């Protein structure tokens, strides 16, 4: 890394395990400065519950970034709306969660931070607070005014991107248009090159229907939409294999010769990845004007403050973000 960079972290739902995981992250040295966008009392109280040392130092944007020393975090303060009891949701803190996301996103957009790592949020409590919220991906897409973003989940062995994300199954076929596929594949290809450092990405593309349509006998979306788009993009030099049946694509004979998989919808690609590497996966938002990674699990309210939360996914998300920072420098 040419110089020390700052990475901003949002712990997510304050009553969940996000604060626990951030405190655990702080127990080791990091080659970047970790700036946590959160309430100070929340973090110090959670550290005390876990019996872990934590020193918070104030965020100083005009000072050079310093590598993180064990037992410390840099604090960018955002105040809670209500006091927190570990494991118990408070509706007003839905506003607090969104405020942390907005501040962290804005800091990435204005160049304060090289990457953003997000902890798990509780979508229900945010919506109950009167804030329409579908998820991190959509929130950052809108706030950054990105033209289009793509959701990817990754483990050490497998990367899966999604053509569509949080749509009901009944709406997916209509959503798979030539324009969408052109846009999604272009973003996936671009970010595999620039953020992952893969010179010539090899992408496996799932069909939409069982058996990838069986030559039109089980749906025509492959013939009408997917194949023509892939042919056009192959002619431009992209290495695309597909459309392939999703029930056979996830085999070593295909995956060993690919850098990423493009699934047509959420539950087509992610169950395989989560079965293979649950707790080790990372959620990545492609197409943003900054690096964003996240844990692949939920708030686990029942584990908050008990010292039983597994920090593995957060560590993987941070390590991947650091690698992506290096690749983009």
From Swiss-Prot:
It catalyses: 4-(phosphooxy)-L-threonine + NAD(+) = 3-amino-2-oxopropyl phosphate + CO2 + NADH. It is found in: Cytoplasm. Belongs to the PdxA family. SUPFAM superfamilies: Isocitrate/Isopropylmalate dehydrogenase-like. It comes from Escherichia coli O17:K52:H18 (strain UMN026 / ExPEC). The active site is located at the dimer interface. Keywords: Cobalt, Cytoplasm, Magnesium, Metal-binding, NAD, NADP, Oxidoreductase, Pyridoxine biosynthesis, Zinc. It comes from the Bacteria. Substrate binds at residues 136-137, 274, 283, 292. Binds 1 divalent metal cation per subunit. Can use ions such as Zn(2+), Mg(2+) or Co(2+). GO terms for biological process: pyridoxal phosphate biosynthetic process; pyridoxine biosynthetic process. Its main location: cytoplasm. This is 4-hydroxythreonine-4-phosphate dehydrogenase. The keyword Iron does not apply.
